[in-house]
């Protein structure tokens, strides 16, 4: 491909920076070094900061002319494992263009999108026209659940006027979206014991506790009824605005998304209320249950059963309050005689971005100029810990991007529309120019 950015992006893509695999620790470090060197080549300062887990990339590209507002840029250079390799139609770490798409692991999540954001800043700096200070604050463990970037931001008192993250996408091609809310997450491991050992079902069945029965009874206390969680798990929800609700009508219908995913709706109105349920409401899911033996023909009462479950918190909810409510409901529902152990493995609060913030309005103007239409304001069903961390500092965050539902993020043949790279560069450049109007 003859585009001038292709070879440069291909260099970054070529580094197999899989943060979840200890065997790729050197590659993760190499990707971090690549990004720092990119900032330095653009005339900025940058360093790779080691941590207890994966490194951070911290740097700054100064505005071309004196005092200017500061834009914090976040992205991640680590990627998901490429497995299963036999399903890829090209080498996962070799950038390839075909049929109008760019294929490679990380091209959409998030190397390609982060590159667009930084390349646009570098081009403006080279022309002496960068109107903002670009503070690079990136990590290499987003795909493995790290928290170093959040800890770093908590300790950094410099502040910023706005943060920009290109690590998202749009539901429909040509219809950009800004995420103004992210859901939080609390993840639990539950162990339930009913005695000292497995028991003969012919001797003790219907008289002694069965750990599998007891666990399913316990879990039922926190599961939704017709898609609605128990009231203690709904406390604090900030409902979507009228503008957000109106925007859902422009998105791909929920029934279509469920069908394309090969999924079936869980409740009667689930498809109709897809965006409400997946972005603006809390959701609790059981991810795995272990107990007894589903393979061997054993006639026993299992003495122990385990489960993993998580709750996605809606914007506005307090993670400590909701996590405590989950544990309380589980303990109250456990049958008498059962021993229940509940361990919270991780948690992160939800985030809200004020859509009327001046920086957000300027960003909407920038996208409207390059896309020819104003972005929709939506919420993300996922969890992005950096958003509430920035909100704690009073920094509004612009979360957007160029991935599509068919970009195969986290799957074989990950891809990004090739035309979205030059469009993204133009849009990011316009974004910096508009944000330069902020009072620094």
Show where each model-derived region lies.
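Oligomerization/assembly interface segments of phage tail-like spikes and tubes
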Residues: 188-191, 303-311
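Short pre-catalytic strand/loop immediately N-terminal to key active-site residues, enriched for Gly-Thr
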Residues: 98-109, 373-377
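Predominant activation on well-ordered alpha-helical scaffold segments within soluble catalytic domains
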Residues: 10, 36, 115-118, 122, ...
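Solvent-exposed residues in well-ordered beta-strands and their adjoining turns
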Residues: 62, 191-195, 312-314
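Acidic/His- and Gly-rich active-site-bordering loop/insert found
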Residues: 1-105, 124-130, 309
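An extended, acidic, His-containing surface patch that forms the Zn2+-binding/catalytic region
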Residues: 172-173, 228-296, 300-304, 315-325, ...
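Fold-level recognition of mixed alpha/beta catalytic cores in primary-metabolism enzymes, strongest
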Residues: 99, 107-267, 273-282, 393, ...
């Amino acid at each position: 491909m003859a585009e001038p950015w292709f070879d440069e992006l291909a260099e970054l893509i070529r580094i197999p920076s899989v943060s979840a695999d200890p065997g790729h620790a050197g590659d993760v470090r190499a990707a971090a070094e690549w990004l720092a060197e990119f900032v330095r080549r653009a005339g900025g300062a940058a360093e790779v900061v080691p941590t207890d887990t994966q490194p951070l990339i911290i740097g700054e590209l100064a505005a071309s002319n004196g005092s200017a507002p500061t834009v914090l840029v976040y992205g991640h250079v680590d990627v998901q494992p490429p497995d299963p390799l036999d399903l890829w139609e090209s080498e996962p770490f070799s950038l390839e263009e075909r049929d109008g798409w760019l294929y490679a692991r990380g091209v959409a999540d998030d190397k390609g999108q982060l590159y667009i954001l930084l390349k646009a800043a570098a081009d403006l700096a080279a022309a002496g026209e960068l109107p903002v200070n670009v503070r690079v604050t990136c990590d290499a463990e987003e795909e493995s659940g790290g928290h170093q970037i959040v800890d770093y931001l908590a300790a950094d008192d410099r502040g910023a006027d706005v943060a920009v993250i290109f690590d998202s996408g749009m539901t429909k091609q040509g219809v950009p979206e800004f995420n103004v809310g992210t859901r939080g997450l609390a993840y639990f491991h539950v162990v339930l014991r009913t005695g000292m050992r497995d028991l003969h079902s012919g001797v003790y069945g219907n008289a002694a506790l069965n750990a599998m029965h007891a666990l399913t009874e316990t879990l039922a206390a926190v599961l939704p009824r017709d898609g609605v969680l128990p009231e203690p798990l709904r406390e604090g929800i900030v409902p979507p605005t009228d503008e957000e609700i109106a925007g859902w009508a422009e998105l791909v219908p929920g029934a279509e998304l469920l069908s394309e995913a090969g999924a079936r709706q869980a409740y009667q109105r689930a498809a109709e209320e897809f965006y409400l349920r997946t972005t603006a409401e809390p959701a609790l899911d059981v991810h795995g249950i272990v107990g007894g033996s589903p393979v061997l023909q054993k006639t026993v009462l299992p003495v122990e059963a385990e489960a993993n479950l998580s709750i996605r918190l809606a914007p506005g909810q307090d993670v400590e309050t909701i996590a405590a409510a989950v544990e309380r409901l589980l303990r109250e529902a456990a049958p008498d005689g059962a021993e229940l152990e509940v361990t919270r493995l991780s948690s992160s609060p939800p985030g809200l971005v004020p859509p009327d913030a001046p920086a957000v309005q300027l960003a909407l103007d920038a996208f409207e100029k390059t896309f020819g239409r104003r972005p929709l304001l939506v919420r993300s069903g996922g969890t992005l810990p950096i958003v509430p961390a920035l909100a704690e500092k009073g920094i509004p965050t612009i979360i957007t991007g160029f991935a599509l539902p068919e970009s195969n993020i986290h799957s074989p043949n990950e891809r990004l529309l090739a035309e979205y790279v030059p469009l993204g560069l133009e849009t990011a450049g316009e974004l910096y120019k508009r944000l330069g109007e902020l009072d620094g």
